[in-house]
Amino acid sequence: MAASCLRPAPTASAQMMTRSPVAGLPRPCSALQRSGCTLQGAFGTFAPQTTRTFVVTWAKGGVMDAPTTTQQPASGVERSQKRPPIYKVLLHNDNYNKREYVVKVLLKVVEQITVDDAVTCMQEAHETGVALVVACPQDNAERYCEGLRLNGLTSTIEPGGC
């Protein structure tokens, strides 16, 4: 009686017919029945295991379709980004603006400059004719130069970095 309640263990071919080796592909049983191909395990026997690899072959033994894998870049890989080119913002001396006004405009237009740096920049422009205000990316340099010009100072930019 106990023997009648037991079912025979599924065979390897029964397991192959019910499971699809790759998600999203047609089940092997229907594809194999239509094409006349055989299904072979890559490791020979079909012992219980977590991963199975199957190869579909033609009757003459040629491989019909080989699995392809795509390698994803490691998540920890950092991509190097190019830094934008650096431009110098130059302040030129003029005989029209007072020194205090030049310092005030420098502090207003260039956010990262300190009072001491603004005074030093103004003094250098007065003594040598030109002074380096700041070296920064091109878009910031153009904005600073335009801001200085709109406030009546003479300013230029040129490529080059520190």
Swiss-Prot record:
Record's keyword terms, sorted: Chloroplast, Plastid, Transit peptide
Full protein name: ATP-dependent Clp protease adapter protein CLPS1, chloroplastic
Transit peptide, residue positions per record: 1-58
Organism, as annotated: Chlamydomonas reinhardtii
Localisation: Plastid, Chloroplast stroma
Underlying gene: CLPS1
Family: Belongs to the ClpS family.
UniProt cross-references to InterPro entries, sorted A to Z: ClpS, ClpS_core, Ribosomal_bL12_C/ClpS-like
Listed HAMAP family: ClpS (MF_00302)
Record's function text: Small adapter protein that modulate the activity of plastid Clp protease system (CLPC). Probably involved in substrate selection for plastid CLPC.
Taxonomic superkingdom: Eukaryota
GO cellular component: chloroplast stroma
Keyword Chloroplast annotated: yes
PANTHER family with a match to the protein in the record: ATP-DEPENDENT CLP PROTEASE ADAPTER PROTEIN CLPS1, CHLOROPLASTIC
Entry keyword annotation includes tRNA processing: no
Any Gene Ontology biological process: protein catabolic process
